[in-house]
Regions:
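Beta-strand initiation motifs
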Residues: 54-59, 180-182
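Helical "lid/coupling" subdomains associated with nucleotide-phosphate turnover
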Residues: 29-34, 48-51, 67, 71-102, ...
């Protein structure tokens, strides 16, 4: 089993880190509106909820079939038509989200945009259209969010749960109890991908279903050591294919809210009898699901067969509910999963914890002297970067800042989206060395401020003991930073003063300036 934070291997199983769900001391007021946007491979969804007494009540739900997953070519580039469908949908969502606070909206992109080589083109314009950042999450992080969404809408019990989510291009499996995901995996197969591969012409034949199920079983085979039948008590299915199948079965008179092997056999027989997707006549089958029902059913049948499932309950929660509750957890550092993930990374890569905490304290002190209002989240990210700035030493001390950036850019870290990890990686990469050699966005004042505070903290903590910060003040005047000390400080700490003067010279090669007034 893989650890929760591991070099990226989206198709592998790994154990999610322990994160106790303590009572959330949130600054959020009752009545606050929150929103989650799920950019799936088949559909884009918008969920709006109202925060009331620690829970989120649904206010509005919008869904549009975009089928972006079908727009990937053989080189894994999204077609312009597929991107345009996505942008048009985001424009409609943006109108509904007008006026929402930035920290109250979470937009999450999944497998199609994980795969797309030209995803940056879509994301850059999508960010501008939506008005909120789109986070491309890893497969394991998608699985964690799915479990959060499912578990939040289930009665609390000590039952061991298996949660399955079959999306357009990926399938997530999760083992967990209560709110804690204990093992997750994400497999690159789904309703859109399997329909394109095995039912491209829309024909339903026994041979096509056999080939599709065999391929799905081969993908699932590597998960059996973790997701074995004795590892869970109750199986739940969420969203997408499972929700659609559950609705079809209920309309046909099968027990509502449940899927059995016998019911799947019945549905397969119906599709084979129809012979083609266009001829399927089933109550509950929506038109947007018709082109992908064959691929979705073949994956679901393989899951039942290989994991030994006899009965699966259809869950109400899904990724978007998980994203909403994740917004709540981020309101307070103590409940932010990313904080415990950083601690796990520090332990795994044998970071010198006292020194990392020292640098984080000094960087935080400097940042607090110059940061504007509502900079708490930026301060938290600076704290994480400072705690991880020596993570690359586990590989080699020479060039450790580059090694650290590589680790963060290629890690599945619970709670983090890939852009967030890249942001931390940039800070770690740039915390030492010549600034002129780096390709950084100097127009991003928040990032530049974080970087300046981190580099100054590293210099002040060079002796790996607590520096004398009495009288040390950092100010910002436009594109100029001014660092002051009390009279006599430079004479007491000549090496620190020397390092700060070198740092000041390095900033001359950037659009920013670091001035020193050392007494």
């Amino acid at each position: 089993m893989r650890h929760a934070v591991s070099v990226r291997a989206p198709s592998r199983c790994y154990a999610a880190p322990h994160f106790s769900q303590r009572a959330q001391r949130s600054t959020m007021q009752d009545g606050t509106l929150l929103a989650a946007v799920d950019l799936g491979s088949n559909s884009f969804r918008l969920e709006i909820g109202r925060f009331e007494h620690g829970h989120i009540q649904r206010v509005e739900y919008l869904k549009e079939t975009v089928r972006q997953g079908g727009g990937l070519d053989e080189e894994r580039n999204l077609s312009l038509d597929a991107m345009q469908r996505g942008w048009d949908c985001l424009a409609r969502f943006a109108e509904r989200l007008a006026g929402f606070e930035r920290t109250h909206v979470r937009a999450v992109a999944t497998q199609t945009l994980r795969e797309a080589h030209n995803r940056d083109v879509f994301i850059e314009r999508g960010n501008a259209i939506l008005g909120y950042p789109i986070d491309v999450v890893s497969g394991p992080e998608e699985a964690r969010l799915i479990y959060q969404g499912v578990s939040r809408l289930l009665p609390q019990s000590d039952e061991r749960r298996l949660v399955v989510d079959i999306g357009g291009r990926s399938t997530e499996l999760i083992l967990g109890q209560r709110y804690q995901a204990q093992a997750v995996t994400s497999l690159r197969m789904g309703s859109v991908a399997w329909s394109t591969r095995y039912f491209a012409d829309g024909n339903f034949t026994a041979a096509a279903f056999e080939a599709a199920e065999t391929a799905a079983k081969a993908m699932l085979d590597e998960t059996l050591q973790v997701f074995r039948p004795d590892a869970w008590d109750v199986a739940y299915g969420s969203s997408g294919t499972i929700g659609a199948v559950g609705e079809i079965l209920a309309m046909a008179g099968h027990p509502p809210g449940a899927i059995t092997r016998e019911a799947l056999d019945w549905l397969l027989a119906k599709l084979l009898r129809a012979g083609h997707a266009s001829r399927v006549r089933l109550d509950g089958l929506k038109e947007d699901r018709r082109p992908v029902i064959g691929g979705g059913l073949s994956v679901l049948r393989a899951v039942f067969s290989l994991l030994g499932i006899e009965r699966m309950q259809v869950a109400q929660g899904a990724l978007r509910q998980g994203a909403l509750y994740d917004l709540l957890s981020r309101e307070w550092p103590e409940t932010d999963l990313r904080t415990s993930t950083v601690a796990g990374l520090m332990q795994r890569f044998a970071v010198d914890t006292p020194h990392a905490q020292r640098v984080a304290r000094v960087a935080g002190t400097l940042f607090g002297q110059v940061a504007t209002k509502n900079s708490e989240r930026a301060a938290r990210k600076l704290d994480w970067a400072a705690r991880l700035h020596e993570i690359g030493c586990r590989i080699a001390h020479s060039g450790y800042h580059r090694h650290g950036a590589y680790i963060l850019d290629n890690t599945d870290a619970a709670g983090f989206a890939q852009p967030e990890l890249h942001h931390l990686g940039l800070l770690v990469r740039a915390h030492r060395g010549k600034l002129r050699k780096l390709e950084l966005d100097w127009s991003d004042a928040q990032f530049t401020l974080q970087l300046a505070c981190l580099r100054l903290a590293v210099a002040l903590c060079h002796a790996r003991r607590d520096p004398d910060m009495d009288g040390i003040r950092l100010e910002r005047k436009g594109a100029r930073f001014v660092l002051r000390s009390r009279t006599g400080w430079a004479a007491l700490y000549p090496q620190s003063a020397h390092l700060l003067r070198e740092e000041s010279q390095d900033w001359l090669r950037t659009p920013w300036e670091l001035m020193l007034e050392l007494g």
